[in-house]
Amino acid sequence: MNDSEFHLLADGLMQALEEALDACQSDADIDCETNGGVMTLSFENGSKIVINRQEPLHQIWLATRAGGYHFDYRNGQWRCSRSGVPLPQVLNEACSAQAGIPVTLDL
């Protein structure tokens, strides 16, 4: 993957995340702020999830209260570089844990 392809994929992911948060039917109050390619999700309890792009590595990084994850684009999906779990699954689990109620983002 070259830098241009990475930018297209990363931009598409960030846009999809914003749309999924807007459409989320959960009772969780999740605020989303994007600044300089970094998306911060803030929860009522003060916890945060940070999603950012690592251009030199062509990765998406996700920082949660439980830990950090690095995602590579493989076979049409962003997948955790360690476990192979798709980003939407990791993000839904992290949002649910931090919100204290089930959260499902339709990505």
UniProtKB/Swiss-Prot annotation:
GO MF: ferric iron binding; ferrous iron binding
Keyword Phosphoprotein in annotation: no
Origin superkingdom: Bacteria
Alphabetized SMART domains for the sequence: Frataxin_Cyay
PROSITE patterns xref list: FRATAXIN_1, FRATAXIN_2
Keywords: Iron, Metal-binding
Disulfide bonds: none
Classification via InterPro entries: CyaY, Frataxin/CyaY, Frataxin/CyaY_sf, Frataxin_CS
Alphabetical GO biological process terms: iron-sulfur cluster assembly
Segments traversing the membrane: none
GO CC, alphabetical: cytosol
Keyword Transport: no
Record-linked Pfam families: Frataxin_Cyay
Family per record: Belongs to the frataxin family.
NCBIfam families attached to this UniProt entry: FeS_CyaY
Function: Involved in iron-sulfur (Fe-S) cluster assembly. May act as a regulator of Fe-S biogenesis.
Name the record gives this protein: Iron-sulfur cluster assembly protein CyaY
Organism: Edwardsiella ictaluri (strain 93-146)
